[in-house]
Amino acid sequence: MEMKWFLSKIQDDFRGGKINLEKTQRLLEKLDIRCSYIHVKRIFKDNDRLKQGRITIEEFRAIYRILTHREEIVEIFNAYSENRKILLENNLVQFLTQEQYTTEMSKTIAFEIIQKYEPIEEVRKARQMSLEGFTRYMDSRECQLFKNECRKVYQDMTHPLNDYFISSSHNTYLVSDQLVGPSDLWGYVSALVKGCRCLEIDCWDGAQNEPVVYHGYTLTSKLLFKTVIQAIHKYAFMTSDYPVVLSLENHCSPAQQEIMADNLQTTFGESLLSDMLADFPDTLPSPEALKFKVLVKNKKIGTLKETHERKGSDKRGKVEEWEEEVADLEEEEEEEEKFKESEIFESVLGENQDKETGVKKLSGVTLFKKKKTRKLKIALALSDLVIYTKAEKFKSFQHSRLYQQFNENNSIGETQARKLSKLRAHEFIFHTRKFITRIYPKATRADSSNFNPQEFWNIGCQMVALNFQTPGLPMDLQNGKFLDNGGSGYILKPHFLRESESYFNPSDIKDSMPITLTIRLISGIQLPLTHSSSNKGDTLVIIEVFGVPNDQMKQQTRVIKKNAFSPRWNETFTFIIHVPELALIRFVVESQGLIAGNEFLGQYTLPLLCMNKGYRRVPLFSRMGESLEPASLFVYVWYVR
């Protein structure tokens, strides 16, 4: 029956005789067979018996079988088929219930699957499934590891903003390093498309009274501020309906701050939040209440009540000035690092410096290299656009408990945050329950490298800001975590990071209810080949767990020699995970290297609690986050609490 169907689909393509590689590729696509060109090219060459670059219908049939026949799928099919040829509707229901843990299973669901994936009409009409149809179903999105219910917004979005992890970027305007790399609008567009909800804009005085965006004291190129926010306006809500926060690193003079304020109001219009919401005069609103809104994060003058009373008044030329303490050692170190960078480039940038006092003056903001205060000037017009995201310097947990207001947010550098998280984790978590806290990379990361964000998610930090332009493990974790909740960029924190009565400490887990996770890594499908001349397709897989310190672990398979097309491991791994709500699972595929070390081939990261049980397909992504379809892993997953 399958042979008859197969020949009916391909005969017309061979009426003119043999076909070449390009026509072979097109015919496979016509048959809905996803395949990598590099693998098809090799298989075509192996099956072209006359080595003329053209194949017969029988040779094509052999290629098709190599690409679609997977022994591991045949074994599952035969286990549930009564005659090893056809799955009856009841057989499919049994498989979905017993192996895939499909809840609320019914013949109706089984029938829908048959109608969608069974290609042979007479089998489909009989409400049955052939091996061909079963293979297509097992290779479909419905059988992916990531739960379908996590692909949509399913969490309660009516909690205050501080109850959520918020996808956040650092130096969003950069697409390379921080010293001489280009600034590019693509940095903002790309971040927004990936679901990022907090963007950083580094603002400086520009020529012709136009504020510019670039990495100060360096040779990075410049973008007009108004052009940046126009791009943000276009893409802000393309991926997510939930609020976008513009985190301004404001180095502009008051005059150009007024221009920034005008640009923001003109560009965003009603989308720009410029006053308190009536229902939230003294608490942070929820993502739901702020749908399609843009929030400005910046320094602010006075209270929200005063801002409300000034609404509609003329603010032109009105400026406030005050001295602000540089409260912590890390900030002094970072100012000094910036100061050193400015010395490197001063001949190019033409900055003026007082050699004796070590003071560098920058467009209305004076930074003191050695003193512990700095003077700030802010235009009232810009200040009044800051509502629920007022930037406030972090001084201490005690100071925050006594004086910090609900709408004041802190930004803490990674070095200081790491020290605090290790020494005073409970106080840090108490702080992040009440106040939005942003963690950013240290200034010495001139190459735009990233830290591991997991350690700061573990203590409830809402905005863990990463350099989105830099691929690697940190961005894999970022992308994996924010797959959840429909990729909305907002994930409700676990109850123990929200509730005041909780005494959770990620380094001292008590009274936990661990999950036992079992993963049987069965096989790989069309794994990518590297460009390395030494690559022989010697493949292995590493499974890693990221979460609280006690849950961090990894295990790996043996190496399958000279087979990247269809390696079979059939190895089982078990993990005990104490805090599953914070755990991420990462699959990494590598090619074994004897001299230069293993070579990265692809990876996939996702939250543990977004993992389907049963036989599942694991898609793979490149180092840059691009899909490597049809490359994937085939696994069996089981976990129980």
Curated annotation (Swiss-Prot):
Residue span(s) of domain PI-PLC Y-box: 382-498
Gene Ontology biological process terms in this record: egg activation; intracellular signal transduction; lipid catabolic process; positive regulation of cytosolic calcium ion concentration involved in egg activation
A single MF term (Gene Ontology): phosphatidylinositol-4,5-bisphosphate phospholipase C activity
Chain ranges of the C2 domain: 498-622
SMART domains: C2, PLCXc, PLCYc
Residues covered by the PI-PLC X-box domain: 155-299
Residue ranges constituting the EF-hand domain according to the UniProt record: 35-70
Keywords for the protein's UniProt record, in alphabetical order: Calcium, Cytoplasm, Developmental protein, Fertilization, Hydrolase, Lipid degradation, Lipid metabolism, Nucleus, Transducer
Domain of life assignment: Eukaryota
Entry EC number(s): 3.1.4.11
Keyword hit for Oxidoreductase: no
Record's catalysed reaction(s): a 1,2-diacyl-sn-glycero-3-phospho-(1D-myo-inositol-4,5-bisphosphate) + H2O = 1D-myo-inositol 1,4,5-trisphosphate + a 1,2-diacyl-sn-glycerol + H(+)
Active site, per annotation: H170, H215
Any one GO CC term of the record: nucleus
Record's subcellular location: Nucleus; Cytoplasm, Perinuclear region
EC class (word): hydrolase
Cofactor: Ca(2+)
PANTHER family: 1-PHOSPHATIDYLINOSITOL 4,5-BISPHOSPHATE PHOSPHODIESTERASE ZETA-1, PHOSPHOINOSITIDE-SPECIFIC PHOSPHOLIPASE C FAMILY PROTEIN
Assembly and interaction partners: Interacts via its C2 domain with PtdIns(3)P and, to a lesser extent, PtdIns(5)P in vitro.
Domain statement: The EF-hand and C2 domains are essential for triggering Ca(2+) oscillating activity and the regulation of PLCZ1 enzyme activity. The X-Y linker region between PI-PLC X-box and Y-box domains may be a target for proteolysis and may play an important regulatory role during fertilization.
Record function comment: The production of the second messenger molecules diacylglycerol (DAG) and inositol 1,4,5-trisphosphate (IP3) is mediated by activated phosphatidylinositol-specific phospholipase C enzymes. In vitro, hydrolyzes PtdIns(4,5)P2 in a Ca(2+)-dependent manner. Triggers intracellular Ca(2+) oscillations in oocytes solely during M phase and is involved in inducing oocyte activation and initiating embryonic development up to the blastocyst stage.
Protein name: 1-phosphatidylinositol 4,5-bisphosphate phosphodiesterase zeta-1
Gene coding for it: PLCZ1
